[in-house]
UniProtKB/Swiss-Prot annotation:
Bias (Basic residues): 316-344
Name of this chain's protein: HMG domain-containing protein 4
PTM-bearing positions, type Phosphoserine: S102, S197, S497, S502, S512
Protein encoded by which gene: HMGXB4
Biased composition (Low complexity): 82-93
GO BP, sorted A to Z: endosome to lysosome transport; negative regulation of Wnt signaling pathway; Wnt signaling pathway
Record keywords: DNA-binding, Isopeptide bond, Nucleus, Phosphoprotein, Ubl conjugation, Wnt signaling pathway
Native source species: Homo sapiens
GO MF, one example: identical protein binding
Length: 601
């Protein structure tokens, strides 16, 4: 009887492929439909033929058959887990032990259906029976298929995937996950979302602790067409999800081994406990047997079970970092602006000591002169140092400008000749070019005799002497003006003693504003040193002129230098009592008057 039921079930399943095509076609392209369903039809036909041939030989009793299927289920669990999930955790191994020890019988599907429909005892009693019948027949046929598939499939990749899907779907109705997105958070921060269609979201109902099965939509499916359609959807979706898990495992071995742990539906409580133990945003314990009603999804919507990579987690991190860096930059700019404003305000408004400016809410840059806040004197000190630095920089710039001023070059005899003779050539040849003018000047200079050239050389030396003399006088004037200013400052303070009037014998000379010079030997030595320096400077300048100086000038310099030397020497007579015949006042006035006739000053 069981064999006949399975044969009828398979015939009904083969006849309903057109309805399945319509149900699963929504949201997919025509090429994918044709390929997937043609392959599926071929496999189903081959499996059906092999099951018919093998069942006649091997299955004599239904009891023996059920015992064989129970042992086969255990073997399939081991083989599928070893083939796909070789690196699973210890929790999965403990689940396998529980599965082995739990007694399995032909009533497993019935018990599951009772557990599914128990919350809906009042509303769905008539639908329970139809669901139980359809699920019982489907589980019977699927167990036959699996038993023979073990021999045929060998080591092929596609058949084990379908075996896993059909083996798990035979025990229960389709499982729906109510979470909108199944998120896989990789170590890099990448999120992968399994997006379900909106109609499936509405029809799904799952608790956080354990998976619950659909209440009314699952039990309303009365005919075998619905169950066959659901089984086919489970096979296809399980195939897609497992292929994705393979690719993910290649990229991230460590993470995928811990994540990909689909628990079979035979022990739903164990699977829920395993899912709870992994509290890292993972809902993958039932990925393989997820069944999707793809007839509810439209072409414009996202396809049910489509995997989308979401980079929002990384983008949020980047945005946070960019916001932090922007805030830091804004703070630094704000501080710089405040600092510059405080400098300007302190430089512009110099409040005198003792005055207190009363203002409502004064800004931090304006300090109180009488009672200033404690942190405010610091910027004042900073600005003082800044102003000193500015002054030093200005002085350095001035010195550089002075040094950079081009000194007048020494004019050669040829240059002096060209300067004077150029006028005559331009008058003779108006509109002459610069090149031709220079050529003519060179020719004339070559034709000049040696006597004329010597005259031009003497003229050049005389001009150079004038230039040097002018520079020396300007330097001395600057030095004397600075000394005079220093003396005026000292007299204003009152450090010096009151002035002494000169005697009536020297009424022709005005009295010196400064203190009368002393007649001590140190003062005499200072006067003699000044005289020596001035005479050496004069001699150096005379050597440059080479005989162009008049005799009267040299004689005047010699006479002045003799007077300037004898005056200080006369002051030394005060040191010996035998020679001390001149009063001190006369000697001091002589030293004072020497400064007017000292040469070079």
């Amino acid at each position: 009887m069981a064999y006949d039921d399975s044969v009828k079930k398979e015939d009904c399943f083969d006849g309903d492929h057109t309805f399945e095509d319509i149900g699963l076609a929504a949201g997919r392209s025509q090429r994918e439909k044709k390929r997937s369903y043609k392959d599926f039809l071929r496999e189903e036909e081959e499996i059906a033929a092999q099951v018919r041939n093998s069942s006649k030989k091997k299955l004599k009793d239904s009891e023996l058959y059920f015992l064989g299927t129970d042992t086969h289920k255990k073997k399939r669990k081991h083989s599928s887990d070893d083939y796909y999930y070789g690196d699973i955790s210890s929790l999965e191994s403990s689940q396998k032990k529980k599965k082995k020890s739990s007694p399995q019988s032909t009533d497993t599907a019935m018990d599951l259906l009772k557990a599914i429909t128990s919350p809906l005892a009042a509303g769905s009693k008539p639908s329970k029976k139809t669901g139980e019948k359809s699920s019982g027949s489907s589980s019977h046929s699927e167990s036959k298929k699996e038993h023979h598939r073990k021999k045929v499939s060998g080591s092929s990749g596609e058949l084990p995937l379908e075996d896993g899907g059909s083996h798990k779907s035979k025990k229960m109705k389709p499982l729906y996950v109510n979470t909108e997105t199944l998120t896989l958070r990789e170590p890099d921060g990448l999120k992968m979302k399994l997006i379900l269609s909106p109609k499936e979201k509405g029809s799904s109902s799952v608790d956080e602790e354990s998976f619950q099965y659909p209440s009314q939509q699952a039990t309303v499916k009365k005919s075998s067409k619905k169950s066959a359609r659901d089984e086919q959807g489970a096979l296809l979706l399980g195939h897609e999800l497992q292929s994705f898990l393979k690719t993910a495992r290649k990229k991230h071995k460590s993470s995928s081994d811990a994540h990909s742990s689909p628990g079979p539906e035979g022990c739903g409580s164990d699977a829920s406990q395993f899912a709870e133990s992994h509290s890292a945003n993972l809902d993958l314990s039932g990925l393989e047997p997820i069944l999707v009603e793809s007839d509810s999804s439209s072409g414009g919507e996202l396809e049910a079970g489509e995997l989308v990579i979401d980079d929002s987690y990384r983008e949020i991190k980047k945005k946070k970092k960019s916001k932090k860096s922007k805030k830091k930059k804004d703070k630094e700019k704000h501080k710089e602006k405040r600092h510059s404003k405080s400098k300007r305000s302190l430089g512009l408004s110099a409040v005198p000591v003792g005055e207190v400016t009363v203002t409502s809410g004064p800004p931090p840059s304006i300090p109180y002169a009488g009672a200033a806040a404690p942190p405010l004197p610091l910027p004042g000190l900073h600005t003082d140092g800044h102003s000193e630095k500015k002054k030093k920089k200005e002085e350095k710039d001035k010195e550089r400008e002075r040094g950079e001023k081009p000194k007048k070059k020494n004019m050669s005899a040829y240059q002096v000749f060209c300067k004077e003779y150029r006028v005559t050539i331009v008058a003779d040849h108006p509109g002459i070019d610069f090149g031709e003018l220079s050529k003519k000047l060179a020719e004339v200079w070559k034709q000049l005799p040696e006597k004329d050239k010597l005259i031009w050389k003497q003229k050049a030396q005389y001009l150079q002497h004038k230039q040097n003399k002018a520079e020396a006088t300007t330097v001395k004037r600057k030095a004397s003006s600075s000394e005079g200013s220093m003396k005026v400052k000292a007299s204003s303070v009152g450090v010096l003693s009151p002035q002494k009037k000169s005697p009536p014998t020297t009424m022709l000379l005005p009295a010196s504003p400064a203190k009368a010079p002393e007649t001590e030997p140190i003062d005499v030595a200072a006067h003699l040193q000044l005289l020596g320096e001035s005479l050496s400077l004069i001699g150096h300048r005379l050597q440059e002129t080479e005989g162009m100086v008049a005799v009267s000038g040299s004689l005047s310099v010699l006479l002045d230098s003799i007077i300037c030397a004898l005056g200080p020497l006369a002051c030394l007579t005060t040191q010996l009592p035998e020679l001390n015949g001149c009063p001190k006042q006369v000697l001091s006035n002589t030293l004072d008057n020497i400064a007017y006739i000292m040469p070079g000053l």
